[in-house]
């Protein structure tokens, strides 16, 4: 397995329903272990498993949370439209929130997509919502360092 470090600029905007409804806008950075099968000419299959720390406005359920995501995508001529995955958000109050996501983008540049909040634990057991996420790739100083 090839290990690559990712820095994630992750923006999430979502409406979620609890006793109330609202929006959140979180950002963060993290690192991912990546498996890559390179077919040449911008054709690759990629799977990843990683963690990130997030921040949001003070008092938001996602402020000072961490997330663990597992997903994958297939690049064809340097572009992808099939990214899928799932994330667990570990909240400061000890609870968890789960999302599924789909995305598209360009290898080495970034991507965006939609996500669905599929549930949580404890007081967030019935949480639901949808939203949009995006990431921007940054250039690393070495070939083994990739930033997204």
Language-model-detected regions and their locations in the chain:
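Conserved small/polar residues in nucleotide/adenosyl-binding loops
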Residues: 146-148
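Acidic, glycine-rich flexible loop segments
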Residues: 84, 90-138
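Extracellular or lumenal secretory-pathway regions
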Residues: 17-90, 141
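Sec-dependent N-terminal signal peptides
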Residues: 6-8
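Positively charged n-region of N-terminal signal peptides that target proteins for export
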Residues: 1-4
């Amino acid at each position: 397995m090839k290990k690559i470090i990712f820095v994630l600029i992750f923006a999430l905007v979502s409406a979620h329903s609890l006793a109330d409804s609202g929006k959140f806008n979180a950002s963060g950075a993290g690192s991912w272990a990546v498996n890559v099968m390179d077919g040449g000419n911008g054709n690759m299959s990629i799977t990843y498993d990683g963690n990130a720390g997030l921040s949001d406005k003070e008092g938001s359920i996602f402020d000072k949370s961490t997330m663990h995501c597992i997903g994958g995508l297939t690049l064809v001529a340097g572009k992808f439209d099939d990214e899928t995955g799932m994330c667990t958000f570990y909240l400061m109050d000890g609870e968890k929130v789960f999302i599924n996501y789909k995305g598209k983008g360009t290898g080495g540049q970034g991507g965006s997509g939609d996500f669905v909040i599929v549930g949580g634990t404890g007081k967030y057991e019935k949480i639901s919502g949808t939203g949009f996420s995006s990431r921007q790739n940054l250039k690393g100083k070495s070939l083994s360092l990739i930033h997204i």
